[in-house]
Swiss-Prot record:
Needed co-factor(s): Mg(2+); K(+)
InterPro entries xref list: Pyr_Knase, Pyrv/PenolPyrv_kinase-like_dom, Pyrv_kinase-like_dom_sf, Pyrv_Knase-like_insert_dom_sf, Pyrv_Knase_AS, Pyrv_Knase_brl, Pyrv_Knase_C, Pyrv_Knase_C_sf
Domain of life: Eukaryota
Subunit field text: Homotetramer.
Name of this protein: Pyruvate kinase PKM
Entry binding sites for substrate: 72, 269, 294-295, 327
Alphabetically ordered keywords of this record: Allosteric enzyme, ATP-binding, Glycolysis, Kinase, Magnesium, Metal-binding, Nucleotide-binding, Phosphoprotein, Potassium, Pyruvate, Transferase
Residues holding K(+): 74, 76, 112-113
Record's keyword annotation contains Kinase: yes
Source species of the chain: Gallus gallus (Chicken)
Primary enzyme class: transferase
GO terms of biological process kind: cellular response to insulin stimulus; glycolytic process
Length: 530
């Protein structure tokens, strides 16, 4: 323990410190210790999909307390009225904590577009009816609208009019996240005959994948345009754009959002082979990336998904863009109160790979244990963050960052380096547009980044970046700039103390600007907590 005593009583975060100081990655792994406590703060954002299991105001309040940072609305399902109700509930739940600036947690709202996806029709009977497709059986896949609402085990309608043109005999059609696979035997004018390779129970309106086929659907469908406009009206904070295949698709989404929606962050979901191949141009055009492993695992072989995940996380970390890891992270918790060991490892490894956010889909939307799932992700993420080999990561990101004459970037790198040197308990950053906080986040400090801002949207969007803990300052700006800086720094200090990030006597690093306005962060101080 002597190592910690050298640091004085100031250092409260043991969080695998012994391992963090190792010289090599191997030595770092050897020193990891299951008895070392992680920090109070969690650096990774948690995104929860809101659905029937979680949309009541009371449930949402509990989700926020358990650690939800971003509420995701999936526009593949539900009407605008339904989503409007959910947005209202999320805001009401968030505002219920607003009376006290210390405990207030901004929660962002994300609109996930349906995108250019292909879906099956309705099974005849009710909306919840299912039919069994048996292995080896013949199934006719048709475009004939007469079957749109009465599919059964013999005929399946799909909504993609060019189906016949893009698939050949011998191709495969996957339905419902790849659970059901069909082999194309012959082609007709408006149908294909298939043989069921992998059967199962089939419900209504399930997703269809055609791996390898050159699907020519527009990047932004008519429904997407209506949904995005609705999102702008509702003032959502970010859009998760589905099935992005090239940079032009991102520009198309941006165009629909228009002038009024120019502050909305666009996160591109990479879900097929083309998206992976053209990753660099997509990343360049987007505000961030989501590794959508569900569809990706059907479009490319399942055993290659981890390669795509690591490549995308690596490139986003190098470029300083946020990246979200999604799909099946704690899938078994839809029905069980505890995750499988594999899922626990998966969440931890996404964090170790360098993901900024981790996401829950069915676990919180329709599962039996939505709160437990959020708490589980929170607990695993904290442990994994403590086990990061920060030193190597910082040096490598520094080596790869382009040398440009931007003072804020130099400040950020210097502040993070100083935070390692003095074992700072936190970095407090004043930020209007959020840029200063994002730059610091890029260098991945061990300590949380308390970002104090007066802009409520900046506060909500800050959750996309690893380590940024937004604090919304509601006090009116002070006439004297220096006084105003002190006022905000003190708010950051009070929040950090109240949340147990640090205590009196600990060192924190404070980043401020010496004149008002956005883009002038140029002063760094190392300050003991009063």
């Amino acid at each position: 323990m002597s190592k910690h005593h050298d640091a004085g009583t100031a250092f409260i975060q043991t969080q695998q410190l012994h391992a963090a100081m190792a010289d090599t990655f191997l030595e770092h792994m050897c020193r990891l210790d299951i008895d070392s406590e992680p920090t109070i703060a969690r650096n990774t954002g948690i995104i929860c999909t809101i659905g029937p299991a979680s949309r009541s105001v009371d449930k949402l309040k509990e989700m926020i307390k358990s650690g939800m940072n971003v509420a995701r609305l999936n526009f593949s399902h539900g009407t605008h009225e339904y989503h409007e109700g959910t947005i209202k509930n999320v805001r009401e739940a968030t505002e219920s904590f607003a009376s006290d600036p210390i405990t207030y947690r901004p929660v962002a709202i994300a609109l996930d577009t349906k995108g250019p996806e292909i879906r099956t029709g309705l099974i005849k009977g009710s909306g919840t009816a299912e039919v069994e497709l048996k292995k080896g059986a013949a199934l006719k896949v048709t475009l004939d609208n007469a079957f749109m609402e009465n599919c059964d085990e013999n005929v399946l309608w799909v909504d993609y009019k060019n189906l016949i043109k893009v698939i050949d005999v011998g191709s495969k059609i996957y339905v419902d996240d790849g659970l059901i696979s069909l082999l194309v035997k012959e082609k007709g004018k408006d149908f294909v005959m298939t043989e069921v390779e992998n059967g199962g129970m089939l419900g209504s309106k399930k997703g269809v994948n055609l791996p390898g086929a050159a699907v020519d659907l527009p990047a932004v469908s008519e429904k997407d345009i209506q949904d995005l406009k609705f999102g702008v009206e509702q003032n959502v904070d970010m859009v998760f754009a589905s099935f992005i295949r090239k940079a032009a698709d991102v520009h198309a989404v941006r165009k629909v959002l228009g002038e009024k929606g120019k502050h909305i962050k666009i996160i591109s979901k990479i879900e097929n082979h083309e998206g992976v191949r053209r990753f660099d141009e997509i990343m360049e055009a987007s505000d961030g990336i989501m590794v959508a492993r569900g569809d990706l695992g059907i479009e490319i072989p399942a055993e290659k998904v981890f390669l795509a995940q690591k490549m995308m996380i690596g490139r986003c970390n190098r470029a300083g863009k946020p990246i979200i890891c999604a799909t099946q992270m704690l899938e078994s918790m839809i029905k069980k109160p505890r995750p499988t060991r594999a899922e626990g490892s998966d969440v931890a490894n996404a964090v170790l790979d360098g993901a900024d956010c981790i996401m829950l889909s069915g676990e919180t939307a329709k599962g039996d244990y939505p709160l437990e799932a959020v708490r589980m992700q929170h607990a695993i993420a904290r442990e994994a963050e403590a086990a990061m080999f920060h030193r190597q990561q910082f040096e490598e990101i520094l080596r790869h960052s382009v040398h440009h004459r931007e003072p804020a970037d130099a400040m950020a790198a210097g502040a993070v380096e100083a935070s390692f040197k003095c074992l700072a308990a936190a970095l407090i950053v004043m930020t209007e547009s959020g840029r200063s906080a994002h730059l610091v986040s890029r260098y991945r400090p061990r300590a949380p980044i308390i970002a104090v801002t007066r802009n409520d949207q900046t506060a909500r969007q800050a959750h996309l970046y690893r380590g940024v803990f937004p604090v919304l300052c509601k006090q009116p700006a002070h006439d004297a700039w220096a006084e105003d800086v002190d006022l905000r720094v003190n708010l950051g200090m009070n929040v950090g103390k109240a949340r147990g990030f640090f205590k009196t006597g600990d060192l924190v690093i404070v980043l401020t600007g010496w004149r008002p306005g956005s883009g002038y962060t140029n002063t760094m101080r190392v300050v003991p907590v009063p």
